A protein has these predicted regions:
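Juxtamembrane regions of bacterial inner-membrane/periplasmic proteins
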Residues: 1-240
């Protein structure tokens, strides 16, 4: 009986300590109300345009499907994924995936280039602040404006023009899938420098689109038959 009571008290103490630590972390991290200003400064630094316009449906759907399929329901973070990230950081095995779009945006805007437990903790707190400071369309817009897509392209507008020669609202499903697949490994999966890797990512994202019902399996099969050279035929020359 005493053992159970002690265990219960220890559990309560652990919860209280965690809540206190989380509260201190929220106080120690900046407010997220300046995310737009940071995004603009980020794009100026990299010589990229800051369109600040709504993200087109196809790219938004492909991004959510492959990077964060619970984007519309989650509180900004995925607790299980956070534990995987911490484990990956401690063991130096990478972040193990699973960071939400909010966390990824927090990393890009507030802790770029940092890969340690302190940075991961800040990203969790900032992700929650971003969640409650901006609407989902605004988060997607900020993400698309600062994400790196490889080959020197920062932001969706520059990547869409650079790879396909079209503005983002004219992306086809296979083009949108290819771009959405680049955000995790923009250099390694660059379809110009590493076409096989780029195609593999396109296939993965297309599979996710089928899984959520955005495209049918026959449609996906047809899209994946389009040669990469055809998708990239107008690279660098945007069409109005």
């Amino acid at each position: 009986m005493r053992t159970a009571k002690k265990a219960g008290l220890a559990a309560v103490a652990l919860v209280l300590a965690g809540a206190l630590a989380f509260g201190l972390l929220m106080l120690a991290t900046p407010a997220a109300g300046n995310a737009r200003q940071l995004a603009k400064a980020f794009d100026r630094q990299h010589g990229a345009p800051y369109p600040g316009v709504a993200v087109p449906y196809r790219f938004a759907t492909a991004l959510e499907a492959t990077e964060d399929h619970r984007f519309k329901e989650e509180p900004g973070v995925d607790p299980v994924a956070v534990l995987r990230v911490v484990y990956g950081t401690v063991t130096r095995r990478g972040d193990q995936g699973g960071a939400t779009l909010y966390q990824q945006l927090a990393k890009m805007l507030y802790t770029p280039g940092q890969a340690n437990l302190t940075a991961e903790a800040k990203q969790v707190a900032l992700a929650i602040k971003l969640k409650y400071s901006y609407s989902r369309p605004e988060i997607l817009r900020l993400y698309a404006d600062v994400a790196y897509f490889g080959n020197g392209f920062y932001g969706l507008a520059e990547a869409s023009c650079g790879y396909f020669g079209v503005p983002p609202d004219r992306l086809s499903w296979p083009q949108a899938a290819l771009l959405a697949g680049l955000v995790q490994g923009p250099s390694a999966d660059d379809p110009i420098q590493h076409p096989a890797a780029g195609l593999a990512r396109e296939q993965h994202v297309m599979g996710r689109l089928v899984a959520i019902g955005a495209v049918s399996q026959p449609q996906a099969n047809a899209y994946l038959q389009i040669p990469l050279s055809t998708l990239l035929v107008n690279a660098g020359a945007c069409v109005g």
